[in-house]
């Protein structure tokens, strides 16, 4: 008896995006040139343009894939935990991402990109699945009387900006702590912000 095994073979476009993402994760977005990606994939420098009209289109595809992957796992750490446990679970997800893949974090969250999401418009109504997970928790906290009534988007921005600012300082070498101690600093600082917005 013969069994057929079907293996999904990535398309050339997927291979190109995979190679660009690999370079970006390991070296940063500046290193992800069309020529370098083409060499890794094994296509000519001109052939890559059949799949992506320019470098920005390729980087946009990488960003969309990365955000999609992040949103699939974001917030699953303590799905049945208390409100506060879920908030800190999201913070841990964020820190795992930012500290574990700093080049990708920088590309997605802080580098200027033409198609990058902009606050507030692109963050409303689930426009950013990662940010949106915390917006939903903030709205829940307000409904349940845990947080003062306020603009959920702006409260979420206050919470995320604190952690992002600390990460920027840490990745820039401006905070002289090991990772474990830095994570504790992030938790304490987030708790201080939460204490300021509690009902």
Where are these regions (language model features)?
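Amphipathic C-terminal alpha-helical segment
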Residues: 97, 136, 140, 160-178, ...
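Amphipathic alpha-helical linker/stalk segments
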Residues: 3-6, 64-89, 119-130, 139
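Hydrophobic alpha-helical connector segments
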Residues: 75-104, 155-159
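Short hydrophobic/aromatic patch on the recognition helix
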Residues: 41-52
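Amphipathic alpha-helical packing segments from all-alpha helical-bundle domains
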Residues: 118-144, 153-157, 184-187, 191
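Short secondary-structure transition hinges
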Residues: 96-136, 175-176, 180
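Basic, helix-initiating cap at the start of DNA-binding domains
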Residues: 1-27, 31-36, 40, 56-60
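Pre-recognition alpha-helix immediately N-terminal to the DNA-recognition helix
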Residues: 15-23, 69, 89, 93
